[in-house]
Regions:
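Bacterial N-terminal signal peptides
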Residues: 1-7
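Substrate-recognition/cap regions that form aromatic- and gly/pro-loop-enriched pockets
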Residues: 358-494
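Accessory, solvent-exposed terminal regions and/or long lumenal/extracellular loops of proteins
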Residues: 290-375, 379-381, 460-472, 476-488
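Second-shell loop/turn segments in exported
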Residues: 138-142, 151-160
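A contiguous strand-loop segment
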Residues: 16-148, 169-329
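Histidine-centered catalytic/metal-binding microenvironments
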Residues: 468-597
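Short, charged, surface-exposed loops that flank catalytic or proteolytic processing sites
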Residues: 159-167
Length: 598
């Protein structure tokens, strides 16, 4: 029997929004996988490039613990980003492995953030933490499990060129050596990965199984002409155990559910439902996952009406697993979807008192009082505390080096600019490898976007238009760069020298965007400092909107100056008259400015 003690559950763990677009659902035959890394506290915002390597027979690979705060790793095993002195004290202690497994002869080059992102073969991964009915702890931390999903994704990057290889490799390691989730509770104790190569895309769910130091897992193929989403909760329902083309799973998937009373094979519970059996539902609050799923599907196909309300997301199954889009999907569509805060719906987060006078969609956590004041804000796909978002694009008709594109957006998606990073990169632009949350760094791409996004809160409804204009300009330039490079390599393989020239063009683009964003911060400061909107923008000052003044208690503020008992005060000015002072008194404090216009 599984017992959940709600009082012990954390209010929120890392929570990520993801999309997967089949090649038949995109504008040009690309597959897309996305991921928003929605961290909090002291995130490690750095990207790292891990080069390809050959390994001696009999070598072993260290297995690293699940560390996501800064620094997530210190050492030489995972690229130059994590060398001591790069964003951490030069005397920082190196990260200690929690185990080892046999190494393979050759490992592929790849980029990573908190998880493996894309390798040189265009294998691509996105992640979304989920709740589960079992909890396991890591080896050395009160448990025996060796693998977190972060490490599994890295090993898949190192060893696999296809999604099926990645699923089988990660699944076998998890069941053989044990799997543990992102938190030591049922809330956030399981995981989902979205995995794509140049041909197909899959969704894979992991559940720890501490009873035998193992895991339960399942994977389902996304139809080529459809789009699926995962928003911090399992989505796979029925599993066809006789359809290896579309399903992969651990051998214990049914036995564990039956043993622990999670599914009755007699027929009482109906068809086996993986989510109903193994999910522990939404975490943080009701609608935390389901509302985002509803919001995403309304973007994918606005013509299909779905109900934003439901009873129990785990039981009710109110939304489709995947959906045909209303129109073919592009990278820019996915940028926009990750910037969604339910605009033009009853849940629009830029509306109402919580949005403030300037319509900010961002909501911060409550203070200590939240433990005694029940309540929640809506959670949208766009989130102010996102560490980074990536939109991964795979294209099998081009050489891997430039066919795979990581559209990388540091910090919150609604404030970032997505820049293209090709799969064949040999060294990351330095600006993407720097990001310490405790120190503003003008060499850091992440800090440029974080800085501007926070400045925009001064007058968000106005400043966001400046940000959108910059996003459109620079993301269009990035798309033009990708198209120009594509044209050079469409015929197939190219010389290493030509590839190096192309990669240098991408690095130069990243640096141009970083410089432009720091300039944008200066523009926003000049336009909206001290509560004003500069005359260069509007030609007139802009004060608080009337609806917000009413909500904020403007009418209950200090009273106007009381009228004199016997006429006005005798106030003289050169060439003036006695009645001027009386005019000021009669006007009242709210009209002083007009009274003093002489």
């Amino acid at each position: 029997m599984i017992v959940v003690i709600a009082a012990l559950l954390p209010p929120e763990v890392h929570a990520c929004s993801t999309f997967l677009v089949g090649k038949g659902a995109s504008v040009d035959g690309s597959l897309f996988v996305t991921h928003s890394d929605d961290g909090e506290g002291d995130p490690d915002a750095r990207l790292s490039f891990i080069p390809a390597a050959d390994h001696a027979p009999g070598a072993f690979r260290d297995v690293w613990p699940d560390l996501e705060d800064n620094p997530r790793f210190v050492g030489t095993a995972r690229g130059e980003t994590y060398l001591p002195g790069r964003g951490v004290p030069s005397d920082a202690k190196g990260t200690e492995p929690i185990g080892k497994i046999p190494q393979v002869n050759h490992t592929y080059a790849y980029t990573e953030g908190n998880y493996g992102i894309m390798n040189e073969k265009q294998l691509s991964i996105g992640e979304s933490t989920c709740s589960g009915r079992f909890v396991a702890n890591a080896k050395g931390s009160g448990g025996e499990a060796l693998f977190c999903v972060n490490e599994l994704s890295r090993i898949a990057m190192e060893r696999c060129a296809t999604a099926r290889c990645a699923i089988r490799t990660m699944g076998d390691l998890a069941t053989e050596h044990g799997f543990y989730g992102a938190s030591g509770s049922f809330e956030g104790g399981s995981e989902t990965l979205l995995i794509a190569d140049t041909s197909e895309g899959w969704v894979m769910h992991f559940v720890p199984y501490p009873e035998t130091n193992s895991a339960v897992w399942v994977a389902k193929r996304v139809p080529d002409d459809e789009v699926t989403v995962v928003m911090n909760m399992f989505t796979i329902r029925s599993v066809n155990l006789k359809d290896p083309e579309n399903y992969m799973y651990s051998d214990n998937i049914i036995d564990v559910a039956v043993k622990h009373g999670l599914w009755d094979p007699s027929g009482k519970d109906g068809v086996f439902d993986f989510t109903k059996a193994y999910s522990d539902g939404e975490y943080a609050h009701k609608y935390y996952s389901g509302r985002r799923a509803w919001g995403a599907f309304r973007l994918i196909n606005p013509g299909i009406e779905l109900d934003p309300n439901y009873g129990d997301l785990r039981i009710d199954d109110p939304y489709p697993w995947s959906m045909k889009p209303a129109k073919p999907v592009s990278a820019s569509d996915l940028f926009a979807w990750h910037r969604d805060w339910y605009q033009d719906t009853p849940f629009d987060m830029s509306k109402g008192v919580a949005a403030g006078p300037w319509g900010s969609p961002d909501r911060f956590n409550g203070c200590d009082a939240e433990v005694s004041i029940p309540g929640s804000f809506e959670r949208s796909i766009a989130l102010h505390r996102t560490t980074y978002t990536h939109v991964l694009q795979t294209r099998g008709w081009l050489p891997d080096a430039i066919g795979g594109i990581t559209w990388y957006g540091p910090h919150a998606a609604h404030g970032t600019c997505f820049v293209p990073v090709p799969a064949g990169i040999k060294k990351l632009p330095a600006a993407l490898t720097i990001g310490n949350a405790t120190l503003v760094d003008r060499d850091s791409q992440w800090w440029a976007h974080r800085y501007v996004h926070n400045l925009a809160q001064m007058k968000y409804a106005y400043a966001v238009e400046d940000i959108r204009a910059a996003q459109a300009m620079w993301e269009n330039e990035g798309a033009e760069l990708v198209a120009a490079v594509d044209a050079k390599f469409r015929g197939g393989a190219a010389s290493p020298e030509a590839v190096d020239v192309a990669l240098g063009m991408f690095e130069a683009h990243v640096d141009k965007v970083r410089a432009a964003w720091w300039r944008l911060g200066d523009v926003i400061m000049a336009n909206y400092a001290d509560g004003f909107v500069s005359k260069a923008k509007t030609g007139a000052p802009v004060g608080y909107p009337a609806w917000w003044l009413e909500a904020a208690g403007w009418r209950q503020g200090p009273e106007p100056i009381p009228p004199p008992k016997t006429g006005g005060s005798k106030i003289f000015r050169e060439g003036g008259s006695l009645e001027w002072g009386a005019r000021v008194r009669r006007a009242g404090s709210a009209s002083l400015a007009s009274a003093f216009r002489v």
